Every structure is written in structure tokens, then in C-alpha cells.
Amino acid sequence: MKNTSKFQNVVIVTIVGWLVLFVFLPDLMIIGTSFLTRDDASFVKMVFTLDNYTRLLDPLYFEVLLHSLNMALIATLACLVLGYPFAWFLAKLPHKVRPLLLFLLIVPFWTNSLIRIYGLKIFLSTKGYLNEFLLWLGVIDTPIRIMFTPSAVIIGLVYILLPFMVMPLYSSIEKLDKPLLEAARDLGASKLQTFIRIIIPLTMPGIIAGCLLVMLPAMGLFYVSDLMGGAKNLLIGNVIKVQFLNIRDWPFGAATSITLTIVMGLMLLVYWRASRLLNKKVELE
């Protein structure tokens, strides 16, 4: 028992130390840097200022933030529309087949997402496989311009983040009470009524979790916007990258990062509140 207790203490200390060293302290450094002044020689001057946050109210940066929210929302809705039927199909398959499809769904996580985006870029380019195939079929006369458009960014985000939507949806659908669905049909409910009034409310936790897992990273995947959208389709993640790596304005980059973190924190708060309300509703029913 003593050895087990010592081992648990070592594990706890290791985890806490890791969080403090690699999460808490870097966050404090970013917060502190966001209130300092830019210096051309040393990047940061130890002079307190709020200008970095007031600059974010500039129409240019505010528009980029709204554009990022819009793109993330569209990508989330697209993932939900595509992911729900697939998760339903996956949950209704025989138990012997499910592990294989789940494995195929998880396999992309083993490959760097940047490499996958490069592959998607080649596939969708003017002389890529998609256009060549459509030209061969005679569906189009000239190649379709997909790359470097907002649509290309959406496609890239959906391509990367779709599994994050499918997994929580699959988990919720798999837990559906079959006798409850059969009872609804016995009482005369149509398939549409059963889906809207029973299935959607019961799978709402998975829907909310999936939307959160897609929307939060969608705002910061700057390399998707760089490779698929070009300079005219920037996300807030691109602004942060440019400020840190190109312009070397670390204080403003830090302020932008903190603002994005606050926005994500508000989304998490909404998710937490929605989850509590859903749990209370289920308990009352």
C-alpha cells in the first residue's frame, strides 16, 4: 500500500509539474508580453501599455476575427451535416464491422495534417486529379478554380476536422435506447417526428461536443488558410503567426492570442451551460 501511495504521489507531482512548466508559465508569459511594448532590437520593451488590445478594435483586425468566426461556423455546420449520417451509419453496423471502420476513421490522425492538406491541395488544383477526372468525363469544359477561395478553406477545415465531429456523435448515437425509439413508432410517430423530437434531443450532447471540437481549432488552423485560401482568406491564426514570425511584433501577437483564448473560453462556457441545462432536462423527463 505504501509503495502504491508513493507511486501515486510521484505521478501527481509529475503531472502538476508538467502543467505548470509547459502550460501555466507559458500562458503567464504570453499574458505579460501582451501588456508590453514592441522593440525592434529585443522584440519586447518593458514598458506597460494597453495599445496592443486597442489595436484589435481596428476594423481590419476586427473583420479578420469576424471572418474567422464565420469560416469556423460554416466548417462546423458542414462537419455536422456530413458527420451525423456517417456516425449514424457507423453506429448501426454489426459489431464485427465497427472496429474496422473506426480504425479507418482514426488512421488519418497518424499522419501529419499539414501533409494531408498538401495532398488535398494537389487534388483540388486546376491541373489536379479532380479537374482532370471531370474533364475526362466531359462534365466540364474548362478546369474549375477551387483553390485560393473561401470554399477551398472550408473544404480544408472539414477535411481535417470531420473525425472530431464523428466520434462524439457516434458515441451518443450508440447509446440511444432502442425500446424508446420502438415505443415512439408504436405510438404513431413518423420517422421524421422520431428524429426531431427524440433522437436529436438525446444526441444533443454529442452534437454540442462535436461542434465545440471542430469550431475551436478551426479558428486557429492558419496553415489551412495559407495553403488553401491564400492572402485574401486570412484567419485569426494567420494574424498571430505573422505577428510572431514575420513582423516580430510579439506584444501584439500575444494580445491577439489572448483575445482568441478568451473567445474560445466563452465558447467552452456556453458548452458547459448547455450541457448542464440538457442534463437537467433529461433528469426532469
Go through the PLM ranges and name each one:
Residues 1-30, 99, 103, 261:
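N-terminal signal-anchor/first transmembrane alpha helix
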Residues 2-6, 10-14, 36, 170-185, ...:
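C-terminal transmembrane helix and the adjacent membrane-cytosol boundary/short C-terminal tail
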Residues 2-8, 53-60, 218, 226-273:
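Interhelical loop and adjacent transmembrane-helix boundary motif
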Residues 13-24, 103, 107, 159, ...:
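Transmembrane alpha-helices
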Residues 24-61, 123, 127-128, 230, ...:
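Short membrane-interfacial helix/loop motifs at transmembrane-helix boundaries
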Residues 26, 30-33, 38-39, 115-117, ...:
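Non-cytoplasmic
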Residues 41, 50, 117-158, 192, ...:
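Membrane-interfacial helix termini and adjacent extracytoplasmic/periplasmic loops
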Residues 59-92:
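Transmembrane alpha-helix signature in integral membrane proteins
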